[in-house]
Amino acid sequence: MTHARYAILGGSSGIGLALARKLTSRGDSVLIGGRSEEKLQAALAELGKHAAGKTVDVTDRLSLRAFFSDAGPLAGLFTPAASYQTGDFRDGDAATSEALFQAKFWSQYWAVYEALPGLHASSAVVLMSGAASARPIGAPAYAACNAALEGLARGLAVELKPVRVNCLSPGTTDSELWRNRPADVRESAYQYWNSLALNGRPGHVDEQAATALFLLDNHNITGSTIYCDGGYTLR
């Protein structure tokens, strides 16, 4: 059996690490990137011999270029890495609104560009947006950024064909990101989400990773967005 190589930005934690586990467990190799050297080394120790990693700043094109410089041929790319804040429109906070696009939209845009030399006809790219694209609850810059990523997936699918490009749009997910927040903040957010999602609970990182893996593996899907959100966008 021939095993493939995948690159994951944000592969040292959360959904990215969950996908890396799934790929290495079936014998594929992964190149993971993350901001924290400590988290990166912990992830590499867990993933074992099929994993390699580099620190990377996804908001810096030169850092992205260095990350992909010796990546070699890639069967797929997943780009969930982002760190950002959201804000209300009436606040008029340009720095927060623009930094959100820099961290989440442009980072994925340029990641695909810098990965191009390693992509081939049967490669797949999975971007990551968020369910607020289809059902905003305020924070319009955040909603617009997620919608822009879904549009980017469609545009890239056309321009980069036969490379497949799709987008994973998760809802609130029980992850390290949320578990590191104060318990009262986390529980309040989860309760609110539970009242909106049809399945009445946040998602799990393994569920999101399984969806990303499906998009990487299914050669008949391109230019699509899958909402792994427990039916949130239907309410």
Model regions: which residues?
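Conserved NAD(P)H cofactor-binding loop of Rossmann-fold oxidoreductase domains
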Residues: 78-87, 230-231
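Rossmann-fold cofactor-recognition segment
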Residues: 47-62
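C-terminal substrate-recognition "lid" of short-chain dehydrogenase/reductases
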Residues: 201-228, 233
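Catalytic Tyr-x(3-8)-Lys segment
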Residues: 186-207
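Catalytic loop of short-chain dehydrogenase/reductase
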Residues: 97-105, 109-111, 122-161, 172
